[in-house]
A protein has these predicted regions:
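Inter-heme linker and motif-flanking segments adjacent to c-type heme-binding CXXCH motifs
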Residues: 19, 43-44, 94-96
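Short Fe-S-cluster ligation motifs
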Residues: 61-79
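Glycine-centered loop/turn positions within well-structured domains
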Residues: 32-35, 71
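N-terminal signal peptide c-region/cleavage motif recognized by signal peptidases
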Residues: 13-15
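C-terminal capping alpha-helices of c-type cytochrome domains
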Residues: 66, 78-96
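Gly/Gly-Pro-rich "capping" loops immediately C-terminal to redox-active cysteine motifs
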Residues: 23-27, 31, 39-67
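Sec-dependent signal peptide recognition
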Residues: 1-8
Length: 96
């Protein structure tokens, strides 16, 4: 009976081995360009930066702000490609 139990346990699905943490495409860009004011979790609020976890802006609104800036937020449209802007915006929407 012990052999059957061991065989059954061996055949059960095994959890995946932990690998290196997955980095989302916009995460590195966010770390480089946004963390100073928004913080790593989007909640820092330095220099008047909004808490990204409580923002009502959708992807379109965030794309506009990242590209053109507003108030104290600088425009990143000349520093980032449109694809990079989309990656940063997509990453910012994952912050909770």
């Amino acid at each position: 009976m012990n052999v059957r139990l061991l065989t059954l346990l061996f055949l059960l699905p095994q959890p995946a081995l932990a690998g290196p943490p997955q980095v989302l495409p916009g995460q590195a860009l966010f770390q480089k360009n946004c963390v100073r004011c928004h913080g790593a979790n989007g909640k820092k609020g330095a220099n008047g930066a909004h808490d990204l976890t409580k923002s009502n802006l959708n992807a379109f609104g965030r794309t506009y702000l990242v590209t053109n800036g507003m108030g104290k937020m600088p425009a990143f449209g000349k520093m980032l490609t449109p694809e990079q802007v989309q990656q940063v915006v997509a990453y910012s929407l994952t912050l909770k």
